[in-house]
């Protein structure tokens, strides 16, 4: 019985926070269409963003010049000057929140959680290049461009595309010019490599010839020096001298044969006379 009593007392205490957390009629809610309009960065270059900021400046009725005739840079500088409350040349997070709330969703300032805070975080993440949490006029005007050459990025950094969708830069003239320039560079590189390969055999032959010239034997060096000085005959003169030596050797042989024949002739005469004497005896 005591347990049932405790459960009955605890049940209202558990249901009370849920009842307070549930939305009630009459509580201001942000329009879903307004929430969708808060997602893009209003400082991003584009005709819709510029028109929205021009309408905001036009509604202030504090501008000497008609905002419709102002370009994007003039509009952003005017917004910067209006919301730089401390006049330090920089916009902090609160000043950005005040500017974007007034420009995008004026009624969102009364909400417990301002949805424009997400837009402020996106602006600081995208345009606060030095990461100090402050926006300068240059950072506000110079919106960083999204990299267009996704093909040059590593596969891990490329955004996945749904199946059946074509790449955005498939037929862009910039990509075709880039591919043509890359093809031209590859052709020039191939020609240079082919020319270098054709010159390598000639360079090797030249190196071999120089090596042969450098590695001459001592006899050839001595002969070359003698030929240059005139002491040793050249190849043609040596051949003529060898022919003359051979002719002289032939003549000497002929003289030797004739001498031997002349020496043998008296001996034959003496032998013949001795034989005649023997016959007579």
UniProtKB/Swiss-Prot annotation:
Residues 148-281 are annotated as: Disordered. PANTHER family: CELL GROWTH REGULATOR WITH EF HAND DOMAIN PROTEIN 1, MULTIPLE COAGULATION FACTOR DEFICIENCY PROTEIN 2 NEURAL STEM CELL DERIVED NEURONAL SURVIVAL PROTEIN. The keyword Signal applies. Residues 1-21 form the signal peptide. GO terms for biological process: cell adhesion; regulation of cell cycle. Its main location: secreted. This is Cell growth regulator with EF hand domain protein 1. PROSITE patterns: EF_HAND_1 (PS00018), EF_HAND_2 (PS50222). Probably digested extracellularly by an unknown serine protease generating extremely hydrophobic bioactive peptides. GO terms for cellular component: extracellular region. The keyword Transmembrane helix does not apply. Mediates cell-cell adhesion in a calcium-dependent manner. Able to inhibit growth in several cell lines. Ca(2+) 2 binds at residues 128, 130, 132, 139. Residues 71-106, 115-150 form the EF-hand domain. Residues 184-213, 237-256 have a biased composition (Basic and acidic residues). Residues 168-183 have a biased composition (Polar residues). The modification Phosphoserine is found at residues 217, 228. Keywords: Calcium, Cell adhesion, Cell cycle, Growth arrest, Metal-binding, Phosphoprotein, Repeat, Secreted, Signal. It comes from the Eukaryota.
């Amino acid at each position: 019985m005591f347990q049932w009593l405790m459960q009955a007392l605890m049940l209202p205490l558990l249901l009370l926070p849920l009842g307070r957390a549930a939305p009630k009629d009459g509580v201001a809610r942000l329009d879903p269409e307004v929430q969708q309009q808060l997602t893009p960065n209003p400082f991003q270059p584009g005709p819709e963003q510029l028109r929205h900021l021009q309408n905001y400046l036009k509604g202030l009725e504090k501008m000497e010049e008609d905002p419709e005739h102002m370009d994007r840079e003039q509009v952003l500088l005017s917004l910067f000057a209006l919301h730089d409350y401390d006049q330090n040349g920089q916009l902090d997070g609160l000043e950005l929140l005040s500017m974007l709330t007034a420009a995008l969703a004026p009624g969102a300032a009364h909400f417990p959680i301002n949805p424009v805070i997400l837009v402020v975080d996106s602006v600081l993440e995208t345009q606060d290049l030095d990461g100090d949490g402050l926006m300068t006029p240059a950072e506000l005007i110079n919106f960083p461009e999204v990299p267009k050459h996704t093909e040059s990025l590593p596969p891990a950094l490329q955004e996945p595309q749904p199946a059946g969708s074509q790449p955005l830069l498939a037929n862009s003239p910039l990509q075709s010019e880039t591919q043509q320039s890359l093809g031209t560079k590859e052709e020039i590189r191939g020609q240079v490599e082919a020319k270098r390969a054709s010159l390598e055999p000639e360079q090797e032959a030249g190196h071999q010839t120089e090596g042969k010239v450098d590695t001459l034997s001592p006899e050839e060096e001595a002969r070359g020096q003698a030929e240059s000085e005139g002491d040793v005959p050249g190849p043609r003169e040596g051949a003529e001298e060898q022919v003359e030596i051979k002719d002289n050797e032939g003549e000497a042989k002929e003289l030797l044969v004739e001498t031997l024949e002349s020496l043998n002739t008296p001996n034959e005469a003496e032998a013949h006379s001795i034989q005649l004497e023997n016959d007579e005896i």
